[in-house]
Amino acid sequence: MKAAWLRRRWLVAGVLFATLSIAVGSYSLAASVRTSQTPTRITIQATPIASFDNRDSSRVRFGALEFRGGLALTSKYQPFGGISAIRVEPDGSHFLSVTDRGSWLRGRIVYEDGKPAGIADAEMAPILGSDGRPLAVRGWFDAESIAEADGKHYVGIERVEKIVRFDYRRDGVLARGEPIRVPDDFKTFTFNKSLECLTAPPKGSPLAGQLIAVTEHSLDAQGNHRSYVLDGNRVTRFSVQRSDNFDVSDCTILPPADLLLLERSFSPLRSIGMRIRRIPLASIKPDALIDGKVLIVADLGYQIDNMEGIAVHRNAAGETILTLVSDDNFSFIQRNLLLQFALVGE
């Protein structure tokens, strides 16, 4: 119990430190990946997480989710860390992530008895701009979200409030990015509190092929998350209800017709929190205020950290699996976690 309390205090201190040093620290870290513009094969060490509840290792059900396993990830490769978003392929194994150093991270989740057991075939590479140079060179390093629509990948970049399109299916991590047109009011987002959530419903879903962006903590006049549907030159504005001091850190689509929001909270007294909400896509309409059911809430009594990425796939048994990842802020007292849950009820 004392060890858990000490870890909580250290993690709170780490988040405070990361918040205070974010402008200088993130940019200097981004500089370290500019020297290589080609993919680098890396080794990721994975320590299994057998239970989600620090107080009851036998417990597996948490709200509407069932814990299937997790990994704490480390690597001796210096640019590794800061995982901000993840997409998992339909096979449930291959994944693509972005980091807040402006890097791609891709690899393969290895399973044993249906549980994550390791990471194989991992590579990192700088995210490239249209000129073939790393986006970090121009200060576009804080990649926070990733989506796929109509065969193209889109990355949301905070601080500069850009969305950049890549032909990843054709060129992989060597794809060159082209900024897409975004609404002028993106310029009014709260600094470093913007494009954490970017997703696109697949064919057959409401709003199929359109980009959905929900801001982290860029709030409207009523204190709710400013949100957008982007469809070429057409823009639909709506808001997501903010509650209980949670802010949006990522999102994904739960086929066929729901939006999953991953959220986090932080305060010196309550420490770190995580929440997932399920919201019907059909509720997204011009100027609407939307909300949804809470699937899970967790704090540092559970195996969480600064949870920043969420993805969905179906396993061979037909179960819906949620994959979550955390951003360690390149801090030695935080962790890069990969957690998996099955959606089993509400």
Regions found by a protein language model. Give the residues of each.
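Sequence/structural signature of beta-propeller domains
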Residues: 2-5, 12, 20-346
